[in-house]
Every structure is written in C-alpha cells, then in structure tokens.
C-alpha cells in the first residue's frame, strides 16, 4: 500500500487542513543523485565539450545524455560554456543533470535551450549552488527581438526536482513546468529583464512543491496556469518582479487545490493577481496566506475583465473557495490602486471568498479603497448570502491606517531594475526568501562544506590507511572540474526545526518528515 505524508500527518492533526490539501503525495526523485552517479557518470568533457565559452555545448550534452539516459548522472563541470544549438533530452529514466558550470547562450533560435521531456525519476541541480544558464537576452532585446528561446522547460516529467540553479536574462520565459507531476523546485535565483514576457516560473502540472525561490523580472514571478492541481508555492521572494498570479485564464480553466504561503513581494506589479477576460471553467480551493508586500502597484487583484488580454468566448471563469489570510505591508498608492480588488464575472459570480487578518496601508497619501463586483463571501467589500446574483462595482474608501499593517522588509530588496538592453549579472542564490522563515533545505554548497569538514574531523580517529582514502574523497569532492561530487546530491536534505514539510521520496521509499 502506498502512503502519503500529508494523509498520515493530517490524520494525526499535525498539518493544517489547507496544507494537507495542497499536495496529493510525495514529491522529488525516486533515487538519489549519488546512486545515479554510482551507476554511471557521463562527463560532457568526455564527449567533446570545452569550457572555453566558444565550443558549442549542445552536441556534447546530447551525447552524454544518450549514454546516461537509462540511469546515470550527466555532469557539466565548473567553467564557462557556449551553447548555440538547443537540446531535447527525452525518454530518460533514473538520471540526473549536474550543472556546475555556466552555460552562455550563443545561438538565436527560438524554442527551449534545454528541454527535458517524457522523463521519470530526474534531478537537475548544481552541487556548488553556482551553476547557471546565462541567456544574454539583452543582446536580442536591444534589437527589439522578443522571440528568442526559453532557458529551461520540463514537459511530461514525473518524480523530479530542480534546485540550486541560477537562471539569468532569458530572451523569453525562464522556467516552464508543463504537464509534470510529483515535482519539487527550490533554492533558485531567477533574474530577468525589466520587460513583459520574461516570466520567472510558470507551472501547469499536478502535485508540485515550489519553495525558496527568488525572482527578479517585470512579468510573472511564480504563476499557476491551467490545468493545475495540488500546487504548493511557499517562501517566494518576488524582488522587483511582476508578482505572483494565476492566468491568464481562458476556456475550460481547470485549477484546484492551490496554496501560496509566505510570499514576499517588493516593488512589483502585484502581490497576487488572478486574471481573465471571459472564458470558462473553474478555479477552486485556493489559499493565499502570509503575504508581505511593499511598494507594489496592486496588492490583491482579482480581475475577470482584465483589459490587457483579448476577450475569450464564454461567460467567465468561476472562482470559489478562496481564502486570503494574514496579508501585511504597504501598497504604492492606495488612492490610485486599492489593496483589495475583486472583480468577478457577472454571469458566474465568485463565492465562498474569505478575507481575514488583512492589513495594508498606502505609502502615498492618506486614503485607500476596497472594490468588489459580483463577489460573495466574508470580509471588506464582499457581499454575504447564498444567492449569488451579479452586482455592480462597490467601492469603500478609508482614510485611516488599519492596525497591525507594519511588516518586515528583506535586506536584499533591489533599489533599481536591470533594464532590458544591458548585461545582467549572475546573482548568488540567497539564503532567505521570506522574513523570519528558514529555507527547507540548505544550499548544496553549504551542505558540501559541512560534509567535507565532518569528513576531515573523522580522519583524526581513522587508521592511517583509512585516513588516506578519506583525504582523497575530500579532495575529490572539492574539485570543481573533472569529477562530480555525487555524495552532496540526492533527494534527502536537512529538515528545519519548527515546521512541517511535505513528503519527499527517499531512495525509492516514501519518507514521512515530522518536524522536531
């Protein structure tokens, strides 16, 4: 019998019901990267790659994958690599891709620089937490070319993780998770240009856990698209970004059981937006909890008549069972754009919308408004009642700050954007993504350092022969070229004190994480 962590923990009363409903089962690869590497390691340098920032990495990467696709680890050592032809790595099983170098886009085709498809039991990571894809999108954007490639796309991938990776300046979207299942994405930094169409993370999949990710761009931060079910998004740092959202939503929308938790949004377009214009289908069972915002144009923005998208045939997307809880901070100008805007379709009004513990205040002026249309539930401008008929926009204006709106800021909040026509530097992955929240997993670079130190301590009590072998292992793990450090990889990482976590696969078995 297959058990799931959330089912067990919720029965024990250890996980809130909304969290238990977010994911439907375990996430992550079935086997560790170290086990994959032990079976076979395919170093791209052995297949013709050169870290000279000139030789095309595409063919060597494809060749290394072909050799390891049935089980093994494809290894890109530290160094600078050029990539002018894109790769589609399909039909792999029980394999991992370790990117410790920096891949620079040198080609101009559209599509996806790296696409993983029809794959199971997969892990993509950097053991140094500094591996990156540098899209150099500014080179195309300066010529008003916005049709360049995406950096990374996963399609039809199950039981996977992507972590400790940096994505920079994509010509188009940065990271798309398309029709995947049982996945985990974490410890990432994404930095794009200040222009629309340069999405951070887009996900339309089932049973996905995205956490501890920083995004800088002008469009989507971490956005759920249709169809999607059982998505948990938490500890997200939208650092001068477009902000998180759902949509754009069109015909036959099918989104349910979505949780956004611990979302920090700085100087962005919105804290959360659900956007549509016509269409059909449903969005249901959504929790938006623990949001902090500062300097954003919009805060909560549900707009079923969003004018920036062309109208879609249909009466509108039905929104129901949405909880907005514990929002704090400030918006840029509450008189121009109030912190609560819930505009629902007149033909299919929203219902069971709950707003509680919501305290935002304007940074400019001394008043703000709340606006609702055809929206039912509890809190602020929402109407109560079980008969959900349409009604015109109602707006409430207030001129005094709510109590408890003050909220912490992050020390790495950016003061300026990176434009879209100049080079964007490769950042480091932060170690904090939401005020007061400890990331679920330490960066792999820090884990490797701790492992090496522990190994060095153990050497002092080993026999001389064993100590010699241990020293060789430590030295090999610290090298940045020629050999991977598989002992630092794998689906099992440290558990922070004081919180519950979803279940990850552990060496082919389901492991139930219970916080100390």
Curated annotation (Swiss-Prot):
Q: Where does this polypeptide localize?
A: Secreted
Annotated signal sequence is 1-21
Residues bearing glycans: 145, 239, 321
An annotated Gene Ontology molecular function:
polygalacturonase activity
Q: Determine the domain of life of the protein's source.
A: Eukaryota
What SUPFAM superfamilies does this protein map onto? Answer: Pectin lyase-like
| Sequence ranges of Basic residues compositional bias | 502-516
Please provide, in alphabetical order, the Gene Ontology terms of the cellular component aspect for this entry. extracellular region
Cysteines paired by S-S bonds: 42-68, 221-238, 344-350, 372-381
As recorded in UniProt, its EC number(s) are 3.2.1.171
Q: Which GO terms describe its biological process?
A: cell wall organization; pectin catabolic process
Provide the active-site residues from the annotation: 219 (proton donor), 294
Keywords per UniProt: Carbohydrate metabolism, Cell wall biogenesis/degradation, Disulfide bond, Glycoprotein, Glycosidase, Hydrolase, Polysaccharide degradation, Secreted, Signal
Keyword Hydrolase on entry: yes
Q: Which EC class is this protein assigned?
A: hydrolase
| Compositionally biased residues, Polar residues | 469-485
Q: Where is this region: Disordered?
A: 462-516
Q: What does this protein do?
A: Pectinolytic enzymes consist of four classes of enzymes: pectine lyase, polygalacturonase, pectin methylesterase and rhamnogalacturonase. Hydrolyzes alpha-D-galacturonopyranosyl-(1,2)-alpha-L-rhamnopyranosyl linkages in the backbone of the hairy regions of pectins.
What protein family is recorded?
Answer: Belongs to the glycosyl hydrolase 28 family.
What is the recorded name of this protein?
Answer: Probable rhamnogalacturonase B
Q: Which organism is it from?
A: Neosartorya fischeri (strain ATCC 1020 / DSM 3700 / CBS 544.65 / FGSC A1164 / JCM 1740 / NRRL 181 / WB 181)
